[in-house]
Amino acid sequence: MSEPLKPRIDFDGPLQAEKIPPLKSARAFDTLEADNFAPARLVTGEEEEGAAEAVVESVLRPKRSLWRRMVSAGLAIFGVSVVAQGVQWTANAWQTQDWIALGGCVAGALIVGAGVGSVATEWRRLWRLRQRAHERDEARDMLHSHAVGKAKAFCEKLAQQAGLDQSHPALQRWYAAIHETQSDREVVSLYAQLVQPVLDAQARREISRSAAESTLMIAVSPLALVDMAFIAWRNLRLINRIATLYGIELGYYSRLRLFRLVLLNIAFAGASELVREVGMDWMSQDLAARLSARAAQGIGAGLLTARLGIKAMELCRPLPWIADDKPRLGDFRRELIGQLKETLQKSKTSPEK
């Protein structure tokens, strides 16, 4: 049997044809555009946080005012006048054979020379820290470049600055993995995968140890002044050790860039100490609650120490972070909590024995 015919369907309006988007014209890249081409990157939360911190830092950075320039010019003129007057005194003392005055001029010249040498050393260290930022920018450009021939010498210079010998196993593996036909991007990527993790692992161990010591010290110390002094000393020592690992010798002025985070860490220790004391006196909790508050305070200070170490790594590291190489604060938090729990358990079991 044949199937019955279906009823007719009437549409209210005419059917609209499916719109097909027009094809875009092809674009051909020349050699120069191909070398400078870089794919767009997705902005992650950490990058947004770093951008926000950069904006805040640029706002808080003091601007050069006219009064500051006038003071600098006045100090420069005063310094030149002192040097000229010293030369004149020395010449007069030599002509009049005033040996006491001549000895004083020589002593003053030695002191001024020592001061100039110290300033020159500080300037050289500050220039070295700024040069590390330029090297990091150069490495970032190489990671997006298809050129050949520059990356090997660049990476060898980084290894020499870090104090790695040519016979180091990581450096030998890197030499075995590269060849002349590889681009600069591939050579720098291999260096970041084979050699740089050796230094990063040492820096991570330094950060973990300093954070753990800060946590345990604050958890057991009853004095806020001792906490603040200990954190200041440990954080400054951590900055110096991380900079030394990456081949940078920090001076006074170059250390000022990181010293603000040290002050933040110190302020946190003192403020949290005050909050703990006031809160515990007001709530009249028992000794166990006090111990829990001390442990929480120690973990907070240890996390700030770890954050300081991560910031120091970012400033002293010669290569930018690639993929998931950047250490996360959550990893140190888990380590600190585990170490603190183990220490508290040992302290509870020891009196029972």
From Swiss-Prot:
<keyword id="KW-0472">Membrane</keyword>
<comment type="similarity">
    <text>Belongs to the UPF0283 family.</text>
</comment>
<keyword id="KW-0997">Cell inner membrane</keyword>
<keyword id="KW-1133">Transmembrane helix</keyword>
<dbReference type="InterPro" id="IPR006507">
    <property type="entry name" value="UPF0283"/>
</dbReference>
<protein>
    <recommendedName>
        <fullName>UPF0283 membrane protein KPK_3110</fullName>
    </recommendedName>
</protein>
<dbReference type="Pfam" id="PF05128">
    <property type="entry name" value="DUF697"/>
</dbReference>
<dbReference type="InterPro" id="IPR021147">
    <property type="entry name" value="DUF697"/>
</dbReference>
<keyword id="KW-1003">Cell membrane</keyword>
<feature type="transmembrane region" description="Helical">
    <location>
        <begin position="213"/>
        <end position="233"/>
    </location>
</feature>
<keyword id="KW-0812">Transmembrane</keyword>
<feature type="transmembrane region" description="Helical">
    <location>
        <begin position="70"/>
        <end position="90"/>
    </location>
</feature>
<dbReference type="GO" id="GO:0005886">
    <property type="term" value="C:plasma membrane"/>
</dbReference>
<feature type="transmembrane region" description="Helical">
    <location>
        <begin position="99"/>
        <end position="119"/>
    </location>
</feature>
